[in-house]
């Protein structure tokens, strides 16, 4: 994948960059693997805003992704590499030998015609899924489970990867994209390789309207609000807020640790660095 730039025909075009989509091989998804997706506008079932700055955006169809990789010992051939509007990574359509079709996240260097498999005896090559106990130390992995059989939850965004650092008892130590080293059960599955579309982080949105297409609404600074709306609001003329930075609910922010202890805390070997 490469980044496409534009001639500065307008202020919005000047800073805008875009993916070339050269790895995409199909323009329409597999109909049996898509669902309707209803937008929430950041509201919960009571109609109250639980996620600010969310709303609008282009209509999307949700692609059903196989995060469990539970179809074991059956090889599958990569039929297409496709765009997915619901995530930053590309997706790959697999045709299994028994006729079933499934989508997976497309790893870097996976091509149409390649064969992948989910198996304990699978080769260590991009796209193959194995339990962590069957993966050699130092291997680059993604799409990692936290609970056995629940489906992958870690390292799923474009360009991300984790690394298997050690094995001890029934746990493997995995270094995550944040720098955190975490213990994960050996029987949890992971996929070999790095998630594709690595240049996604280099794409420049370029203009406010393009963010609106993605369903992102404007983020208003607290100092620009009234006192009724934010602790930093109010004051005569332009002010700095007059206090240490806080959230709209008065909780310190910008470096203040807010993570509470959880049942999973003992499994963190090293805290994140980012």
Swiss-Prot record:
- One Gene Ontology term, aspect cellular component: large ribosomal subunit
Q: What is this protein called?
A: Large ribosomal subunit protein uL2
Keywords noted in UniProt? Ribonucleoprotein, Ribosomal protein, RNA-binding, rRNA-binding
Family matches, as InterPro entries: NA-bd_OB-fold, Rib_uL2_dom2, Ribosomal_uL2, Ribosomal_uL2_bac/org-type, Ribosomal_uL2_C, Ribosomal_uL2_CS, Ribosomal_uL2_dom3, Ribosomal_uL2_RNA-bd_dom
Record function comment: One of the primary rRNA binding proteins. Required for association of the 30S and 50S subunits to form the 70S ribosome, for tRNA binding and peptide bond formation. It has been suggested to have peptidyltransferase activity; this is somewhat controversial. Makes several contacts with the 16S rRNA in the 70S ribosome.
The biological processes this protein is annotated with in GO are: cytoplasmic translation
For the region Disordered, give the residue spans. 224-259
HAMAP family in the cross-refs: Ribosomal_uL2_B
Family according to the record: Belongs to the universal ribosomal protein uL2 family.
List the Pfam families: Ribosomal_L2 (PF00181), Ribosomal_L2_C (PF03947)
GO MF term (any one): rRNA binding
Q: How does it assemble?
A: Part of the 50S ribosomal subunit. Forms a bridge to the 30S subunit in the 70S ribosome.
């Amino acid at each position: 994948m490469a980044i496409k730039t534009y001639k500065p025909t307008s202020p919005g075009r000047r800073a805008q960059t875009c993916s070339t989509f050269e790895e995409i091989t199909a323009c329409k998804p597999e109909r049996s693997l898509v669902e309707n997706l209803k937008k929430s506008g950041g509201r919960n079932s009571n109609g109250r805003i639980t996620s600010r700055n969310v709303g609008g955006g282009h209509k999307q169809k949700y692609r059903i992704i196989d995060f469990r990789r539970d179809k074991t010992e059956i090889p599958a051939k990569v039929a297409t590499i496709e765009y997915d509007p619901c995530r930053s990574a590309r997706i790959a359509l697999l045709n299994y030998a028994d006729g079933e079709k499934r989508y997976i996240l497309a790893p870097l260097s996976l091509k149409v015609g390649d064969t992948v498999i989910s198996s304990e005896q699978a080769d260590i090559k991009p796209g193959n899924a194995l339990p962590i106990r069957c993966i050699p130390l130092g291997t680059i992995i993604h799409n990692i489970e936290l609970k056995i059989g629940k489906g992958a939850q870690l390292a799923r965004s474009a360009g991300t990867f984790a690394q298997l650092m050690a094995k001890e008892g029934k746990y493997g130590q995995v270094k995550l994209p944040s720098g955190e080293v975490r213990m994960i059960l050996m029987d949890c599955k992971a996929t070999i390789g790095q998630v594709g579309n690595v240049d996604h982080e280099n794409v420049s949105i370029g203009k406010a309207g393009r963010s609106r297409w993605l369903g992102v609404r404007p983020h208003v600074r607290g100092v620009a609000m009234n006192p009724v709306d934010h602790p930093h609001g109010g004051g005569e003329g332009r002010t700095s807020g007059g206090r240490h930075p806080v959230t709209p609910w008065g909780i310190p922010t910008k470096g203040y640790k807010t993570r509470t202890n959880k049942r999973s805390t003992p499994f963190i070997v090293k805290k994140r660095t980012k």
